[in-house]
């Protein structure tokens, strides 16, 4: 029997009730739960050393929530190679695989090993200040340098490898993975990229130039975003988490991560079928 973890977003009205029903279901079938029912906020912001140790021993994680909950969980699961399956309690759910009405039939298949793994490319981001590299972060969707809540645009120099591509005056810049191409980057006018293609996308947010267009960059290249605004109000965010302030001269180096998100898939729905369904649902 696989050892299962359950992570929930208790901001969702159904989440706690569904989690308890699921825990009972697993217990009745003597499926071991490697961690107690865990709120995603605890997992991301204040995990105990014991919780971190037990997380590494899981065979799979079931996520009850929406795409945001799955993103948060995936960043912690990916370094340990733990597969993740999302149960959609949100609205669109591009990444989640199971609707809550189908939860228990889906669990039967998962426990029996009747699923496939879909690997998604992730990003690694590192803030560089005064020439010193700060600890790195993983992202499944995107890394964003933005003006935050300040009304003025920021100036950001974008380099690919050692070559400066452009200096943007804009509300910000998005570096996204193919998975993130249907998130913030899409709303900023970026292209939709199949997750089977490994690449980095550079998308400006409301640029002050008509010729500032999105770029698609090979997976083996790193993107460096350097704040050159004299007024220091830029912020860098990873997968929409609370941001870290940046000052003039700070850089963020973004590259393809050495780890990947492993998503559990049950059906044969293609990326483009999911895209059609979710786009129509979001109208």
Swiss-Prot record:
Q: Looking at the keywords, is Cell inner membrane present?
A: no
Catalyzed reactions:
NAD(+) + ATP = ADP + NADP(+) + H(+)
Pfam families, per the entry: NAD_kinase, NAD_kinase_C
Q: Which residues take part in binding NAD(+)?
A: 67-68, 141-142, 152, 171, 182-187, 241
This one is known as NAD kinase
Q: How is this protein annotated for GO cellular component?
A: cytoplasm
Q: Which SUPFAM superfamilies match?
A: NAD kinase/diacylglycerol kinase-like
Annotated GO MF terms: ATP binding; metal ion binding; NAD binding; NAD+ kinase activity
Q: At the top level of its lineage, which domain of life is listed?
A: Bacteria
UniProt similarity note:
Belongs to the NAD kinase family.
């Amino acid at each position: 029997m696989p050892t299962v973890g359950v992570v929930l977003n208790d901001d969702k009205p159904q989440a706690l009730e569904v989690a308890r029903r699921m825990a009972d279901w697993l217990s009745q079938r003597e499926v071991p739960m490697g961690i107690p029912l865990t709120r995603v906020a605890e997992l991301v912001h204040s995990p105990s050393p014991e919780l971190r140790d037990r997380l590494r021993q899981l065979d799979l994680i079931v996520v009850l929530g929406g795409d945001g909950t799955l993103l948060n969980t995936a960043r912690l699961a990916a370094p340990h190679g733990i597969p993740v399956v999302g149960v959609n309690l949100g609205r669109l759910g591009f990444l989640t695989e199971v609707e809550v009405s189908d939860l228990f039939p889906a669990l039967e298949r998962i426990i029996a090993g009747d699923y496939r793994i879909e690997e998604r490319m992730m990003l690694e981001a590192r803030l560089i200040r005064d020439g010193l590299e700060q600890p790195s972060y993983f992202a499944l969707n995107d890394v964003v340098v933005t003006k935050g809540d300040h009304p003025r645009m920021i100036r950001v120099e974008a380099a690919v490898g050692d070559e400066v591509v452009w200096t943007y005056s804009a509300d910000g810049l998005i570096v996204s993975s193919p998975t993130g191409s249907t998130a913030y980057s899409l709303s900023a006018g970026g292209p939709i990229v199949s997750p089977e293609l490994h690449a980095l996308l550079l998308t400006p947010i409301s640029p002050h130039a008509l010729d500032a267009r999105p770029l698609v960059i090979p997976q083996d290249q790193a993107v460096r975003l350097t704040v050159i605004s004299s007024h220091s109000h830029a912020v860098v965010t990873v997968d929409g988490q609370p941001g870290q302030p940046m000052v003039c001269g700070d850089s963020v180096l973004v590259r393809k991560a050495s780890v990947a998100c492993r998503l559990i898939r049950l059906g044969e729905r293609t990326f483009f079928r999911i895209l059609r369904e979710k786009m129509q649902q979001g109208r």
